[in-house]
């Protein structure tokens, strides 16, 4: 049907032959951009297709995908704004006088403007890069005609159609936030809308227990907003439970309230407020903003994957692909969050896209190693991790076959202001309980956790033992040294709190 609607007087063969490429990439997020740019560097003629379906509240954005526009970048900038505000409160302890704590107020509009100016600058940088690399960019929606032919519909008012073909097609369309199937769900927003709100969110209910929900709760609370998080199951599934406990307990000290054992039944508009009715004995409460952060769904609805023979997981809807990123039909590939059983991390998508292009256009055999990938949750006290959690290690090796070294510590920058956050800072190493003492996982809760874990992730990747850690001379004083100072095991029952400073 689509073929017949486009210039019927032109032969189909001519339409396709005039728009042939070596590679078509659908989706200009982190994975799609990485794959496109690498392929172009290797001499491929590349078509990159990307369009953003506006949110139910009308917000859309430029090239770069979730991370650059409504994910990692704006989120981390707002996290940094929260850190700056906290440091101001401790400045007088370090001799910085004249800061009137009563006059310190946060201006949401200033932050939002500056954050989104940075986002738009990134959009422009991406467009310049595509132009420099002679990548053919189409601001359009894509749909498969068959596995190597794509019909695109432009975002212009005429919705201009065109046809493209290539022997290699990469799908990298990512995920979008999920709206619940309840009355009034449309009255809520998602993280796709949060960073461009015209005014401060006010009293906010965040529904979800994953990293998006908790990170948003953290920085909004720091901006003096009344924040409640509804956690329907366990928070931060897949992360080490000891670490999650300290993150959650600390989050509560910042003023974030945590609702458990209830769900949202419906949302109603009451003037400018949102009246939320909870299940069971949860009652009814009014909020200024409701944020849905309980899961994400594949951004695939317009692609018509059946025409290409691309199989998806029946439960998640994600694309099934092998370790070489090959989908279920020859010539179609998938990278990034859209792939089943892959961690939803920007750096993984970038690496996957790059190595896929290498395999397609430079005879490379290298594939991504999905084990031992480090990640960070940017809650007020950050949580970083690489490798197995204690729970995963027990499940895989047995409780008697692993050893857990751990410590509570006080970050040096917390000493002078006597920052009470130190009571939640924690470090853990999980290793085998044999002569090798091979490190299975490293976990850190504290300030600058991402900066701490990155170097250890390199060491973890090449394989290190507990003795390697303990025989490493520390940099002192810093939080990172807590890993190399570890010596108390959980099994011993000794007090894991660090004592003293330089001895």
UniProtKB/Swiss-Prot annotation:
Co-factor binding comment: Binds 1 FAD per subunit.
Tell me the keywords, alphabetical order.
Answer: Cytoplasm, Disulfide bond, FAD, Flavoprotein, NADP, Oxidoreductase, Redox-active center
| Membrane-spanning residues | none
Cofactor(s) this protein requires: FAD
The record's Gene Ontology biological-process terms are: cell redox homeostasis
The protein's superkingdom reads Eukaryota
GO cellular component entries: cytoplasm; cytosol; mitochondrion
Positions binding FAD in this chain are 58-67
Q: Which family does it belong to?
A: Belongs to the class-I pyridine nucleotide-disulfide oxidoreductase family.
Task: Tell me the function of this protein.
Answer: Maintains high levels of reduced glutathione in the cytosol.
Its protein name is Probable glutathione reductase 2
Question: What is the organism of origin for this protein?
Answer: Caenorhabditis elegans
């Amino acid at each position: 049907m689509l073929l017949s609607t486009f210039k019927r007087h032109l032969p189909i063969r001519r339409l396709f032959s005039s728009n042939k490429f070596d590679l078509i990439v659908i989706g200009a997020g982190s994975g799609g951009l990485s794959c496109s740019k690498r392929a172009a560097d290797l001499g491929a003629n590349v078509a990159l297709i990307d369009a953003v379906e506006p949110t139910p509240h009308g917000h859309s954005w430029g090239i770069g995908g979730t991370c650059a526009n409504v994910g990692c970048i704006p989120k981390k900038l707002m996290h940094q704004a929260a850190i700056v505000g906290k440091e101001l409160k401790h400045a007088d302890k370090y001799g910085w006088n004249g800061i009137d704590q009563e006059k310190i107020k946060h201006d949401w509009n200033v932050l939002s403007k500056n954050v989104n100016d940075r986002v738009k600058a990134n959009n422009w940088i991406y467009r310049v890069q595509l132009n420099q690399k002679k990548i053919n960019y189409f601001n359009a929606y894509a749909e498969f005609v068959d596995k190597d032919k794509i019909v695109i519909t432009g975002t212009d008012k005429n919705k201009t159609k065109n046809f493209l073909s290539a022997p290699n097609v990469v799908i990298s369309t990512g995920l979008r936030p999920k709206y619940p199937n309840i009355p009034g769900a449309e009255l809520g927003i998602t993280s796709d809308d949060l960073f461009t709100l015209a005014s401060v969110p006010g009293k906010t209910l965040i529904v979800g227990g994953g990293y998006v929900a908790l990170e948003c709760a953290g920085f909004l609370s720091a901006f003096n907003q009344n924040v409640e998080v509804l956690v329907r199951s366990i928070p931060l599934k897949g992360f080490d439970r000891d670490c999650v406990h300290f993150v959650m307990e600390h989050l509560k000290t910042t003023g974030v309230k945590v609702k458990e054992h209830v769900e949202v039944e419906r949302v109603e508009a009451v003037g400018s407020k949102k009246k939320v009715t909870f299940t069971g004995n949860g009652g009814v409460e009014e909020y200024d903003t409701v944020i849905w952060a309980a899961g994400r769904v594949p951004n695939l609805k317009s692609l018509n994957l059946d025409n290409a023979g691309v199989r998806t997981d029946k439960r998640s809807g994600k694309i099934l692909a092998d370790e070489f990123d090959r989908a279920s039909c020859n010539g179609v590939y998938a990278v990034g969050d859209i792939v089943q059983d892959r961690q939803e991390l920007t750096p993984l998508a970038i690496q996957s896209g790059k190595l896929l292009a290498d395999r397609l256009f430079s005879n490379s055999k290298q594939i991504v190693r999905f084990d031992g990938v480090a990640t960070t949750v940017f809650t007020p006290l950050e949580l970083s991790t690489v490798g197995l959690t204690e729970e995963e290690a027990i499940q895989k090796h047995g409780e008697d076959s692993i050893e857990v070294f751990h410590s509570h510590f006080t970050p040096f920058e917390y000493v002078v202001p006597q920052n009470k956050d130190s009571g939640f800072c924690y470090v853990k190493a999980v290793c085998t309980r044999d002569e090798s003492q091979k490190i299975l996982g490293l976990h850190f809760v504290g300030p600058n956790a991402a900066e701490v874990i990155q170097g250890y992730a390199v060491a973890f990747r090449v394989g290190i033992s507990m003795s390697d850690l303990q025989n490493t001379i520390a940099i002192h004083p810093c939080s990172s040294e807590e890993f190399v100072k570890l010596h108390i095991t959980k099994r011993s029952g000794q007090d894991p709190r660090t004592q003293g400073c330089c001895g």
